[in-house]
Amino acid sequence: MRDAIIRKNANLVRTCLSCLSLCLPCISNGSPGVDICQEPIAESNLSIAYYDNEKTSFERNLGETNRDNFSTDLQFKMNDNWIFGVGHRSAILDVERLELQTNGYLHTFFVPVHRLDQSDNKSFRFSIAPALSASSNVTKDPNEYTADALQLLVALVWGEQISDRLGLSYGICGDHRFGEYQVYPVIGINWQPHADWLIELGFPASRLSYEVTKSLTSVLQIAPNGNEWYVKNKSLDKHSQFVYEAYLLEWALSWRAHQKIMLTASVGREFHSRYEMTLLNETRIRVSSDPTTRVGVSLAWFC
């Protein structure tokens, strides 16, 4: 009896660690935007993350920029069907030789709600997250809120387990990960060639996960990495939309240091980066920037 309980608990731990490896990008999310398409982690948790981007140059020698990203996520799993949360994304943008209609402090506050259903080998998830995305001089004053500062992020994703090692997911998502709001199809094929490996090929994200040990997981992922903010100048008499779009190739290593604590370190490369922004003189520009490297660290505590 005692051995059976031990085996059951061991299997449960392995299952949880497997889930964590699949959901690592959720925990260490240093994206300027919100990824509502990603399956939420199957545990209540509080996580914080910091990412530092190296300085990069705009095309045509228009200027230089660097960015710091911060994220905070609080998630509560009510039961097998409902997951609620609240989150915050913050980007500190420093731009040289260009005067923008923003102070460079960009925030996105969001409240995600996930409904999950599963029967036999099929699953369905509906996720929705109202969000406020704007510069700090807007978010701190409710009188400055407008419809342009609000976002509604949604995802409807179906899943089917074709075999023990092969799964299929498909659906639609609507968010700002490509910059301006887009509704786009989601499709993915999940293949587990070995108990320690998982290959997920799809759109808009693909990833390779490897369980190094029972407490150490490695993930390589490529995904869109953009967002949009409603911004105002210092005197609040000018406003515009600030749009950023890019792709991110990132490797992350996660260490489950304790049953309730997980540490993650990562290094990534952003490319195909484009900014659409309004200058202080009302000129609207769209410029690309050179690829940039970023490093990050995150800490998650599981309730």
Task: Tell where the protein language model's regions lie, with residue ranges.
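Hydrophobic, lipid-facing positions within transmembrane beta-strands of outer-membrane proteins
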Residues: 66-74, 105-111, 132, 150-156, ...
